[in-house]
Amino acid sequence: MNKQAATEKLVAVDIGNTSVNIGIFEGEQLLANWHLGSVAQRMADEYASLLLGLLQHADIQAGELNRVIMCSVVPPLTTTFEEVFKTYFKATPLVVGAGIKSGVKIRMDNPREVGADRIVNAAAARVLYPGACIIVDMGTATTFDTLSESGEYIGGAIAPGIATSAQAIVEKTSKLPKIEIIHPAKAIGSNTVSAMQSGVYFGYIGLVEELVRRIQAELGQKARVVATGGYASLIAEGSRIFDIVRPDLTLQGLRFIYQMNKV
C-alpha cells in the first residue's frame, strides 16, 4: 500500500435536529469526533470556520480530507454542509438517500419514508452485529429500528427523546422549572426539581424498556439491543435492557456505506 492510500481519510457527517456529529476516519480508526449545534440560520462560512479550527486543534490537515459522506434529517443544513465541503475542502459529499447502496433491504409500506439516519444505523448494525437486532437511537427523537435474523429492516417505533420530553413539560406548565437531565439516586424526589428529574429519567427508561420488550415479543426471538445517540450512555446507566452501547454507530454506518459506493 502506498503512503497516499495509507493516510487517506474520510469525513463522516451526521446532521441531526439538535447537533451535527462529525467524525474523521483513517481506515477503520476514528481519529476525531466533534459535535456542533444544528443551527439552520448559521452560514456555511461559520460552520467552515468552526470545523477548520477543530481540525487545526487535532493536527489534521484540511487538504487530506477530500472524501466526505453525509446523512441528514435537516434539508437546509444538508445544503449548507455541501457548500462547506465544496468551497473549503474541494470535496463533493456523498449524501445518503435514493440511489445510494446501503446493503439494507427495507421491508416497509413506503421505504422512502425511512430517515437516512435510520438506514445508516441499520447498515452499521447489519455489519457489526449480524442477526436480529433492535437499535435504540436516543436523540431529539428516540427511534427503535428492527432488523430481522436475515438483516432486513422491518420497521420500528418513534418516540419523543428524553430532552424533548423534559422541554415539553416545562413549556406546557406555568410553574415547573427547566431541569438538568441526570440519573437520580432515587425515584422519590424530595423537591420539585428532583421529582421532575426522577419522572423524566425513570419514566423514559420505562418507555424504552417496554417498547423493546414488545418488539422482542413480536419478533418471537431474542434480538440484540444496541443503544446509540447522545443520551445512550446516560440511559444505559439505569437500565439493563441494552446488550451494547455504541455512541459512534451512525458514523460507523456512514463509513460502511461510503465503502459500498466507492467508484
UniProtKB/Swiss-Prot annotation:
Main location: cytoplasm
Annotated positions binding ATP: D14, I15, G16, N17, T18, S19, V20, N21, T140
Location of the active site: D117
Cofactor: NH4(+); K(+)
Reactions that this protein is recorded to catalyse: (R)-pantothenate + ATP = (R)-4'-phosphopantothenate + ADP + H(+)
A Pfam family the protein falls into: Pan_kinase
Keyword field: ATP-binding, Coenzyme A biosynthesis, Cytoplasm, Kinase, Metal-binding, Nucleotide-binding, Potassium, Transferase
Known pathway: Cofactor biosynthesis; coenzyme A biosynthesis; CoA from (R)-pantothenate: step 1/5
Subcellular localization: Cytoplasm
GO terms classed as biological process: coenzyme A biosynthetic process
Keyword flag Transferase: yes
GO cellular component: cytoplasm
Record InterPro entries: ATPase_NBD (IPR043129), Type_III_PanK (IPR004619)
GO molecular function: ATP binding; metal ion binding; pantothenate kinase activity
Binding annotation for K(+): D137
Entry EC no(s): 2.7.1.33
Top-level class of the enzyme under EC nomenclature: transferase
Sequence positions that bind substrate: G115, A116, D117, R118, T192
Subunit structure: Homodimer.
Family, per entry: Belongs to the type III pantothenate kinase family.
Protein's name according to its UniProt entry: Type III pantothenate kinase
Source organism: Dehalococcoides mccartyi (strain CBDB1)
Gene that this sequence comes from: coaX
